[in-house]
Design a protein with these regions (language model features):
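Hydrophobic helix-and-loop "lid/oligomerization" segment in the mid-to-C-terminal part
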Residues: 22-48, 56-95, 99-102, 108-119, ...
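Short hydrophobic alpha-helical segments enriched in small aliphatic residues
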Residues: 5, 15, 19-22
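Short glycine/serine/threonine-rich phosphate/pyrophosphate-binding segments
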Residues: 52-58, 128-132
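Active-site cofactor/cluster-binding pocket
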Residues: 101-167
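Short alpha-helices
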Residues: 150-230
Length: 383
């Protein structure tokens, strides 16, 4: 009797979640589980400079496909996660991270995988340009492509969707992360593809990591109570949240900490009238602190801890690579409350994102990027 009651509670919980998180299907009535059943060579893509959500959502899908079983399909499936460039060292502990291929370092090995793939799973981006040179190669292969993402679509991307680039689209800007969407898919749509109805610990760990990192440890974009019901389920599945937090946030190098101190002490400008902070870091300055990918992660949030600072922007210079004449400036935008930064990021800095968290980039010098900033902030910021 007790077992029956537990099953009823379990089923009721996911009926509620299904109501909370209705997904937007693509224009074709194709079952994703069926696509996975038929596919033999699957490639999973995520965006440049992979963060916790990119890593978590792609690795959760990777583990799922590896464990996929059905009554019709039992043979081995080749599945590979390919990222455009290196991911931060503080995410290298994630289950399966050692199997990820980095296109920037392994393009010769990656290109045949992309060309031979019969299914692409694309997570945490909606613009093929966000995966660098792999984007064109993905577009050249006419096999089914599934999109899972929580970023806003501009008109150009909506046009690609309308043209049928993706055979299935799960786009939910209201979700806190792509991992939230992946969780919903795995639990409600694809669960029958697993050997049993457990959510394996590897998948649960990857999903929790994405939820945690994309909300700043649940400090922003995390007010929906349904999110905490998902977290509760993941904890019941065996996720060790304290260990994950320690692995992500308490493993910084000495150089990273010194870079953070330098950025806040020497490089932060405050615009009091506009409640705005700006931090700029040149490539030479980053070299002084032996910069590694991810060392500036979270830096943009720190000025928001200052009283009366509601907007924060960071700029980080990447040197021009061989064959490219200009440096690339990476920008991060953060804000608090009803103060959007995504329009500013989109219209001025070729980026976009969420209302309170966006990104952008500029091809050119750091001085040029700062000039764009100085000529535009008064238009986009509420005083």
């Amino acid at each position: 009797m007790l077992f029956f009651v537990k099953i009823c509670i379990f089923q009721s919980f996911f009926v509620l979640l299904h109501g909370f998180y209705g997904l937007r299907a693509g224009t074709h009535s194709i079952d994703m589980k069926e696509l996975i059943e038929k596919a033999k060579h699957i490639v999973i893509f995520t965006h440049m400079a992979p963060d916790g959500d990119a890593m978590g959502s792609s690795l959760a899908l990777w583990h799922y496909v590896r464990e996929f079983k059905s009554s019709r399909v039992q043979e081995f499936k080749e599945v590979t996660v390919i990222v455009p460039n290196a991911f931060p060292a503080f995410l290298s502990w994630m289950p399966g991270a050692e199997q990820i291929k980095i296109y920037e370092k392994e393009s010769a090995a990656c290109n045949p995988l992309i060309e031979q793939a019969d299914l692409f799973l694309c997570t945490d981006f909606n613009d093929p340009k966000r995966i660098g040179p792999m984007g064109e190669k993905m577009l050249a292969n006419p096999v089914p492509k599934i999109l899972i993402d929580h970023h806003l679509m501009d008109e150009r991307i909506r046009g690609l969707v309308d043209e049928g680039l993706w055979v299935e689209v799960h786009s939910h800007p209201e979700a806190c992360s792509s991992c939230e969407i992946v969780f919903k898919l795995l639990r409600d749509e694809w669960i029958s593809g697993l050997e049993d109805e457990r959510l394996p610990n590897e998948i649960a760990t990857c999903i929790y990591t994405g939820l945690m990192t994309d909300t700043g440890n649940f400090s922003y974009n995390s007010t929906n109570y349904e999110l905490y019901e998902i977290i509760a389920f993941l904890l019941r599945a065996g996720v060790q949240k304290d260990e994950i937090y320690n692995a992500v946030f308490n493993q910084y190098s000495t150089d990273r900490q010194r870079l953070t101190g330098y950025a806040l002490y020497r490089k932060m400008r405050i615009f009091p009238e506009y409640h705005l902070a700006l931090i700029t870091l040149s490539a030479d300055e980053l070299d002084q602190f032996h910069y590694q990918p991810g060392d500036c992660e979270g830096l943009v949030n720190m000025p928001l801890q200052i009283a009366d600072v509601f907007y924060s922007v960071t700029m980080r210079e990447e040197r021009a690579k061989p064959g490219t004449p200009k440096s690339r400036i990476r920008l991060s935008f953060r804000s608090q409350g009803d103060r959007p930064v995504n329009v500013w990021a989109s219209e001025v800095f070729h980026g976009g994102g969420h209302m309170n968290a966006s990104g952008g980039e500029v091809l050119g010098s750091l001085a040029y990027a700062v000039k764009l900033f100085e000529n535009s902030y008064m238009k986009y910021i509420k005083k």
